[in-house]
Amino acid sequence: MLALKLQKKYPELTNEEILTLTDQFNKLDVDGKGYLDQPTTIKAFEDSKKGSYDEVREAIREVNVDSSGRVEPEDFVGIFNVLKKGVEGTEVKKGRITIKGSSSSVSHTINEEERREFIKHINSVLAGDPDVGSRVPINTETFEFFDQCKDGLILSKLINDSVPDTIDERVLNKQRNNKPLDNFKCIENNNVVINSAKAMGGISITNIGAGDILEGREHLILGLVWQIIRRGLLGKIDITLHPELYRLLEEDETLDQFLRLPPEKILLRWFNYHLKAANWPRTVSNFSKDVSDGENYTVLLNQLAPELCSRAPLQTTDVLQRAEQVLQNAEKLDCRKYLTPTAMVAGNPKLNLAFVAHLFNTHPGLEPLNEEEKPEIEPFDAEGEREARVFTLWLNSLDVTPSIHDFFNNLRDGLILLQAYDKITPNTVNWKKVNKAPASGDEMMRFKAVENCNYAVDLGKNQGFSLVGIQGADITDGSRTLTLALVWQMMRMNITKTLHSLSRGGKTLSDSDMVAWANSMAAKGGKGSQIRSFRDPSISTGVFVLDVLHGIKSEYVDYNLVTDGSTEELAIQNARLAISIARKLGAVIFILPEDIVAVRPRLVLHFIGSLMAV
């Protein structure tokens, strides 16, 4: 019966071919489920020499296997038919792979060398991992990597490699007996990936969701992977980790001015510091054209390790050959990573940046400071710094441009604040009244910046914010307390607007309403913990927020993993677990476990408000 149906659907196939295929399918379907998973299907066609990994993968897409990913007998024959005709899916030109998009009129391009180098990095850092170690090394020459990412485990592990403890891995759904996770469990893991990446800082998540990862959308996954790797590399370029970075200050530059520089600029400063020390006349201002001939790299490596890395590559006239010699020198320092000769010559900015950052992280080559030289860094304002970190992530999540890396400094001209108002309540801002940033890229004149900030304060007053004593000049001058007060009320308005749009009665929620909701969720889960306000000291153990999550989705909270929170370490374990569970639910959480344990009321409110919005 099935053979007749298939013969009608695929008249171009012989009866013998159809019978052979159905017989092959039945042998592969050892459990008699009536379907195969995609990895089994791909391997079957690869083993029988019917097509390469990428060809079979594209054929599966062409026969429109449903969202479950299950390949039924009819699909299996259809895949063979597509392979027999020839697959048109990808095209490679000069190291760039063009792939079909979601519709026939859309295509996307990915860089072949970037894919290869990022996969090599992942294979290296995940080797021996108890959960995914058996899945590496992943083939660097096929699209298998994107399929391996679908269940979120590889990406979760990569996030924790870049920024340790971002994800509490106890909340992840993991394979058992090598059986692939179902789509629902994959989406839960991918929620953790997306929402954790949003909270890492320095990562833009505006066009990728959990479903895109599940569907294996290559250009989106590769873009996310690059940002995660980049975040890990640049996160170590920090004066608190490397006080010797103080040596890079230029004449008449203050430490405060230096600390405002984004990490990429500090890397370029570091590169040029060594070139100058080597009496080399050239400088670098980018990670593309200025390094493409390999000369500056040759001098940098020689300066970092003269006994191992000579300047001999400068005598080589062929740039590709010189690039290879540069990387051979880097190999002597155990730093041949991310970059290839062709990527260097092509001036690939991502791979060059990764190479230089890795070089800095392993061989900074800066003399340690003695006691007299150590700079006086402002005392750490825990409350203010924690809030500034969360507010930075929140503002960046609104897709403001340029993105913020130095909270107080980046808000001084008022433009980001005004963009945020317009994102929260569209058409609030009359842009004709706003002073634009100079086209030259220079800093806006102070009086114009103050005018913008005055406008931002006025808009806040119109929204009923409490801004007594706050003027635009306070924002322009970088007043920490007053800037935080304004941005907090903007974020609070954003939370209440979101909840207002979701509530049936359309009621604007007060803090006490949110506290009551949290208490009701904790009670619903059968737990007795309650709080009086977002300042309640009992929040510090982390147990209350877990009880709230248990009330929302009881199966997500395993109380065997919950401690009494009696010590700071145990409380942080609880808080970290709660944050990852919230992200698994789909909540966008920007705070750190320490914010819950320290009972920072504004940040606890953000946590509860984000749960209410799920």
Swiss-Prot record:
GO terms for cellular component: actin body; actin cortical patch; actin filament; actin filament bundle; cell division site; cytoplasm; medial cortex; mitotic actomyosin contractile ring, distal actin filament layer. Residues 112-233, 261-364, 385-495, 508-614 form the Calponin-homology (CH) domain. It is found in: Cytoplasm, Cytoskeleton, Actin patch. Ca(2+) 1 binds at residues 29, 31, 35, 40. Residues 369-614 are annotated as: Actin-binding 2. Disulfide bonds: none annotated. The keyword Transit peptide does not apply. Keywords: Actin-binding, Calcium, Cytoplasm, Cytoskeleton, Metal-binding, Repeat. PROSITE patterns: ACTININ_1 (PS00019), ACTININ_2 (PS00020), CH (PS50021), EF_HAND_2 (PS50222). One of its GO terms (molecular function) is actin filament binding. Residues 98-368 are annotated as: Actin-binding 1. Ca(2+) 2 binds at residues 66, 68, 70, 75. Residues 16-50, 51-86 form the EF-hand domain. GO terms for biological process: actin cortical patch localization; actin cortical patch organization; actin filament bundle assembly; actin filament network formation; actomyosin contractile ring organization; endocytosis; formin-nucleated actin cable organization. Binds to actin, and functionally associates with actin structures involved in the development and maintenance of cell polarity. Plays a role in cytokinesis. Plays important roles in mating and in spore formation. This is Fimbrin. It comes from Schizosaccharomyces pombe (strain 972 / ATCC 24843) (Fission yeast). The gene is fim1.
